[in-house]
């Protein structure tokens, strides 16, 4: 469950290490984002020489949340950290690698490029 001012780890190789959520997309009064939801964020920490730099405003898709999510079969999924992948305007990832597992909900929401790059889909 990600909201405004939430900080997330970046799970790709764009050069950003941490982002801060500034808006949850999907309606004027939408408050929370879960796995597979798109947010607008600003880069708070980045490595030198990366494709994004500190202060950039980017769009990202949430791939891991600490808050558990109930699946249609009744099972729950939760992770040890909140993480996101920075995306382009066409919802393809800006980086070329994804680090760590991602939720199966990304496949349902048509983020196939992220799912194919991820080392593990839970």
UniProtKB/Swiss-Prot annotation:
Annotated GO CC locations: cytosolic large ribosomal subunit
GO biological-process terms attached to the record: translation
CDD domains (alphabetical): Ribosomal_uL14
SMART domains, alphabetized: Ribosomal_L14 (SM01374)
Nucleus recorded as keyword: no
Pfam families in the record: Ribosomal_L14
Keywords: Ribonucleoprotein, Ribosomal protein, RNA-binding, rRNA-binding
A GO molecular-function descriptor: large ribosomal subunit rRNA binding
Function: Binds to 23S rRNA. Forms part of two intersubunit bridges in the 70S ribosome.
Entry's family note: Belongs to the universal ribosomal protein uL14 family.
SUBUNIT field: Part of the 50S ribosomal subunit. Forms a cluster with proteins L3 and L19. In the 70S ribosome, L14 and L19 interact and together make contacts with the 16S rRNA in bridges B5 and B8.
Descriptive protein name: Large ribosomal subunit protein uL14
Originating organism: Mycobacteroides abscessus (strain ATCC 19977 / DSM 44196 / CCUG 20993 / CIP 104536 / JCM 13569 / NCTC 13031 / TMC 1543 / L948)
